[in-house]
Curated annotation (Swiss-Prot):
Disruption phenotype: Cells lacking this gene show high-level specific activities of acetate kinase (Ack), phosphotransacetylase (Pta), isocitrate lyase (AceA) and malate synthase (AceB) irrespective of the substrate. The transcription level of the rpf2 gene is increased 20-fold in the ramB deletion mutant during growth on acetate as the sole carbon source.
PROSITE patterns: HTH_CROC1
NCBIfam families named among the record's database cross-references: Reg_Aceta_RamB
Residue ranges constituting the HTH cro/C1-type domain according to the UniProt record: 10-64
Protein name, per record: HTH-type transcriptional regulator RamB
Organism: Corynebacterium glutamicum (strain ATCC 13032 / DSM 20300 / JCM 1318 / BCRC 11384 / CCUG 27702 / LMG 3730 / NBRC 12168 / NCIMB 10025 / NRRL B-2784 / 534)
Residues that span the membrane, as ranges: none
Cited CDD domains: HTH_XRE
Length: 474
């Protein structure tokens, strides 16, 4: 272990636990002066002290790693790329030092920029709507608040993991008696618990109204559409069980956020309740164990736990429990037009607000190979290498002639974790010449000579020779 100075991180940990330097020193069996020297980067962190900290406070060693800052660093870079507020270029090294030494300041900067973007968008809509009628203005003004983006960013900032809620769901799953390959038994167990413990009446509906389930708190009537399979029905029931048995935790998590509208807060509550349902259907320790044993085989795990491909892939991205972490995955759901309706990441992979998406990313290739699992060894401009697994999923197929919903699901991890998965078979992840060069999107991508480039990068000036043609248009 080389010399690692972790003063700001140790200070952050101490303040989070409301400890004085003397109390922390006593807990670790060190002198107060020794702890003071570590906090002020006079002494480096040694392996024995690191082990004492991880044992005493239950944090992973990665808490003190600069690699763990990569996502926050990417978010700060995103702020710096907004030319309306920052016309100058800031060196990456400067941003890296700020993120590592002052993480709370960096996070505050990112959150302030998010609020600024919301205000800017609303102001732009207000100006554009001056000639519209009141009826025309109202839906546009409501849409610009974008509550789904607020919720998405809220979950993203928490690395898609809620420890207390996950453990509560896991305990309930144990009481329900989870069994492999038997989602119908889980459905029956949840139904009995709702009926016996909460006086809920469950009924089936065949109406084609678009509603898949509905619970009336007044009548205690839960209606579930008949076309859902056992796993889907169990998931909806588990969601309502969350409101009834873990609402204190759900509300507490959501209260930790800052919401621009009541709709955003309500959407967040539903999102966190869905997280609870997934944690009941795929209990953490069992799911983590089976994932490790199977090499994170998404289709196998889906069959074992009786849920769909998307639910399984999303649950894999939540395996971030301290001292029992899975592979840190990035999860995305996109449509043919490139709209990213879901994005969560436990890695340094960052989704910029300005660059769009990269057409060389294999997530988009899956639409020409529906239902087939595709793999890609890809490299980002910063040199990080990723393994991406992508497949399409269809939602709610109904009758002939009706338009169904198709999405591409992408699950990616850094190449250093890839050998733990079945998807690395046949790949030479050491040969970087086989990696596909991708980026966050053309406007923020620094990659040169990319034939697929659609827009010039904001990182430099456009140099065009009227008498010369090149592979890249800019």
């Amino acid at each position: 272990m080389g010399k690692t100075y972790v003063g700001s991180r140790l200070r952050q940990l101490r303040r989070e636990r409301d400890l004085s330097q003397a109390s922390l020193a006593a807990t670790l069996g060190l002198s107060a002066s020794y702890v003071n020297q570590i906090e002020h980067d006079v002494r480096p962190l040694t392996v024995p002290v690191l082990l004492r900290i991880t044992e005493a406070f239950g944090v992973d060693a990665t808490f003190f790693s600069r690699d763990d800052d990569s996502r926050l660093l990417a978010e700060v870079q995103d702020v710096m790329l907004d030319r309306e507020i920052n016309p100058a270029n800031v060196e990456l090294q400067e941003l890296s030092e700020m993120v590592y030494n002052h993480p709370q300041l960096a996070r505050a900067m990112v959150e302030m920029h998010q609020r600024y973007r919301n205000v800017r968008d609303k102001f732009s809509i207000a100006v554009d709507n001056r000639t519209n009628t009141p009826e025309e203005r109202r839906p546009i003004a409501e849409a610009v608040s974008m509550p789904h983006e607020e919720v998405r960013d809220f979950i993203y900032a928490r690395q898609n993991y809620f420890d207390a809620l996950d453990r509560r769901a896991e305990a309930i799953a144990a009481q329900l008696g989870w069994q492999p390959y038997d989602s119908r038994a889980m459905e029956d167990s949840i139904a009995r618990r709702l009926q016996m413990d909460h006086d809920v009446t469950i009924t089936s509906s065949k109406e084609e109204s678009g509603t898949l389930h509905h619970f009336d708190p007044e009548t205690r009537l839960l209606t579930i559409h008949a076309r859902l399979n056992p796993g889907q029905r169990a998931f909806r029931m588990a969601t309502e069980l969350g409101y009834l048995e873990a609402n204190d935790l759900i509300e507490g998590i959501v209260d930790d956020g800052i919401w621009s509208t009541p709709e955003a807060r309500t959407l967040a509550i539903r999102g966190v309740a869905s997280y609870f349902a997934a944690a009941v259907m795929l209990p953490y320790k069992i799911f983590h164990s089976e994932a490790e044993k199977s090499g994170y085989d998404i289709e196998y795990l889906g069959q074992l736990f009786g849920v769909g491909y998307e639910t399984t892939a999303h649950r894999l991205s939540t395996l971030q429990r301290p001292n029992l972490r899975g592979i840190p995955f990035t999860f995305v759901r996109v449509d043919r037009a490139g709209n990213m309706s879901k994005r969560q990441s436990a890695t340094g992979f960052h989704f910029t607000h300005y660059g769009g998406t990269c057409p060389l990313w294999n997530v988009f290739e899956t639409f020409t190979n529906p239902g087939q699992v595709l793999r890609q060894f890809a490299q980002m401009p910063d040199g990080r290498n990723y393994l991406w697994i992508s497949r399409t999923v269809r939602h709610h197929e109904a009758r002939f002639g009706e338009v169904d919903k198709m999405f591409a699901i992408g699950l990616g991890c850094e190449a250093r974790h890839a050998d733990r998965t079945v998807y690395s078979r046949g790949f030479n992840l050491q040969d970087l010449s086989t990696a596909t060069p991708i980026g966050s999107g053309c406007r923020v991508c620094t990659r040169e000579n990319c034939a697929q480039r659609a827009f010039p990068s904001v990182h430099g000036r456009i140099n065009i020779d009227a008498h010369e043609s090149t592979i890249a248009p800019y």
